[in-house]
Curated annotation (Swiss-Prot):
This is Metal cation symporter ZIP14. A motif (HHHGHXHX-motif) lies at residues 248-255. It is found in: Cell membrane; Apical cell membrane; Basolateral cell membrane; Early endosome membrane. Pfam families: Zip. The lineage of its organism: Eukaryota, Metazoa, Chordata, Craniata, Vertebrata. Residues 29-155, 206-221, 371-394, 443-457 are extracellular. Residues 1-28 form the signal peptide. Optimum pH is 7.5. It comes from Mus musculus. The gene is Slc39a14. Disruption phenotype: Homozygous knockout mice exhibit growth retardation and dwarfism, visible even in neonates. They exhibit moderate osteoporotic phenotypes associated with decreased bone volume and trabecular number, and increased trabecular separation. The length of the long bones is also significantly reduced. The decrease in bone mass is associated with increased bone resorption. The metabolism of these mice is also affected and they constitute a model of metabolic endotoxemia with high body fat, hypoglycemia and hyperinsulinemia. It catalyses: Zn(2+)(out) + 2 hydrogencarbonate(out) = Zn(2+)(in) + 2 hydrogencarbonate(in); Mn(2+)(out) + 2 hydrogencarbonate(out) = Mn(2+)(in) + 2 hydrogencarbonate(in); Fe(2+)(out) + 2 hydrogencarbonate(out) = Fe(2+)(in) + 2 hydrogencarbonate(in); Cd(2+)(out) + 2 hydrogencarbonate(out) = Cd(2+)(in) + 2 hydrogencarbonate(in).
Length: 489
């Protein structure tokens, strides 16, 4: 038997080893996959983000953004002189400068390989991951931030519309004793509560904490309003049921000690009654007769219970508040109302100005809430000024003058929001809105319904209250959810 050449077994082993080595590559080729190599990953990155085997600064930024590298700062910032701390998050422009490249340079495959250790170091240090979300929010804020012309223009427009509400008081004086006036006033008070409360929940307070609608806080804020509305609805239903059940156990005396105003009510209750629908008790009866086109009877008595805080002196014999009077004859309450309204309107303007520096829709939402709150307040304030001794012209002038303080607050709000953080202003306005809605206007809404409840008319005011609350809530909810999708101008 002829012996095999000694080198033949070695050759066979080499052939078998070669077939075994090429089998994975043949399988990969048959599967349509490129052969793996050190450059495969680089080629994949270049094909995904680059063009013609090169990367521009914009294309590199896209890659770095996907890796959360270089997004902690402005990506076109210039490198600073001096030693660098490697734990700092560098921008893509800084990385270009570190490799002696300009912002208009293009890097090839060999240059990109030099970037890999830098990118890996940035990923390993995690210097940019904590700043990524804040940077994206800042970029979105800068892109959607209104210009100075838009801020001042929209701000002055909204404040002007709100201030004009102070001039509407004279137009409703002849209708103060009408039933529809009380119904309309009740609706606007409920609307003001819904808008103020919802604006604080959906926009002002979340903005003070730095939230945005993408943080899914809107649904939780809606649940907060739902809890408030649930207890309001339940309380009203229980009161109606208990009233009907206990009605036959009590007499029908409408002049009990609970309904008669106390001395404190006579001195301080004028402010509390500015929208209670009982405005006929705040105006002398003979003046109401003249407003209705009737001459006062000789046996009519002048009701001055709510006017006891002023020194009427000898003015009870005529409608002195329809004529011009000296400022010294005007009651102190009128000046207190004017000053407090001026401060109130200043804070309103502050909130409007700060809101417009963030976004147009933020400013519009705040303006809508303030408008719904100012309309019923201005009507009531006008009546208070009349009862304090002012003429119609004087009441209109000082009511409008206090409303113009909103312009001053607007200017301060815009300047503060443009140069400083507006979060503190939003926090202040949010607390103020909650107080006005729940502690001020909510009791007024209940007082308006007292006369209807005495007359066993529960359903109509209850429906009006619900319509006002839900309308205000819906307006603020829609403005919050779709503020980023609707474009103005």
């Amino acid at each position: 038997m002829k012996r095999l050449h000694p080198a033949l077994p070695s050759c066979l082993l080499l052939v078998l080893f070669g077939i075994w080595r090429t089998a994975p590559q043949t399988h990969a080729s048959s599967a349509g996959l490129p052969p793996l190599s050190a450059t495969s990953f680089l080629e994949d990155l270049m094909d995904r983000y680059g063009k013609n085997d090169s990367l521009t600064l914009t294309q590199l930024k896209s890659l770095l953004d996907h890796l959360h590298v270089g997004v902690g700062r402005d990506n076109v910032s210039q490198p600073k002189e001096g030693p660098r701390n490697l734990s700092t998050c560098f921008s893509s422009g800084d990385l270009f400068a570190a490799h002696n490249l300009s912002e208009r340079s293009q890097i090839g495959a060999s240059e990109f390989q030099e970037f890999c250790p830098t990118i890996l170091q940035q990923l390993d240090s995690q210097a940019c991951t904590s700043e990524n979300q804040k940077s994206e929010e800042n970029e979105q804020t800068e892109e959607g931030k209104p210009s100075a012309i838009e801020v001042w223009g929209y701000g002055f427009l909204c404040v002007t519309v709100i201030s004009l509400c102070s001039l509407m008081g004279a137009s409703v004086v002849p209708f103060m004793k009408k039933t529809f006036y009380k119904r309309l006033l009740l609706y606007f008070i409920a609307l003001a509560i819904g808008t103020l409360y919802s604006n604080a929940l959906f926009q002002l307070i979340p903005e003070a904490f730095g939230f945005n609608p993408q943080d899914n806080y809107v649904s939780k804020s809606a649940v907060v309003f739902g809890g408030f509305y649930l207890f309001f609805f339940t309380e009203k239903i229980l009161k109606m049921l208990l009233k009907q059940k206990n009605e036959h156990h009590h007499g029908h005396n409408h002049f009990t000690s609970e309904t008669l105003p106390s001395k404190k009510d006579q001195e301080e209750g004028v402010t509390e009654k500015l929208q209670n629908g009982d405005l006929d008790h705040m105006i002398p009866q003979h003046c109401n007769s003249e407003l209705d086109g009737k001459a006062p009877g000789t046996d009519e008595k002048v009701i001055v219970n709510s006017m006891s805080v002023q020194d009427l002196q000898a003015s009870q014999s005529a409608c002195y508040w329809l004529k011009g009077v000296r400022y010294s004859d005007i009651g102190t309450l009128a000046w207190m109302i004017t000053l407090s309204d001026g401060l109130h309107n200043f804070i309103d303007g502050l909130a409007i100005g700060a809101s417009f520096t963030v976004s147009v829709f933020q400013g519009i939402s705040t303006s809508v809430a303030i408008l719904c709150e100012e309309f019923p307040h201005e009507l009531g304030d006008f009546v208070i000024l009349l009862n304090a001794g002012m003429s119609i012209q004087q009441a209109l002038f000082f009511n409008f003058l206090s409303a113009c303080c909103c312009y001053l607050g607007l200017a301060f709000g815009i300047l503060a929001g443009s140069h400083f953080s507006a979060n503190w202003i939003f926090a202040l306005a949010g607390g103020m809105f909650l107080y006005i809605a729940l502690a001020d206007m909510f009791p007024e809404m209940n007082e308006v319904c007292q006369e209807d409840e005495k007359n066993d008319s529960f359903l109509v005011p209850f429906v009006i209250q619900n319509l006002g609350l839900l309308t205000g809530f819906s307006i603020m909810l829609v403005l919050t959810m779709y503020s980023g999708q609707i474009q103005i101008g």
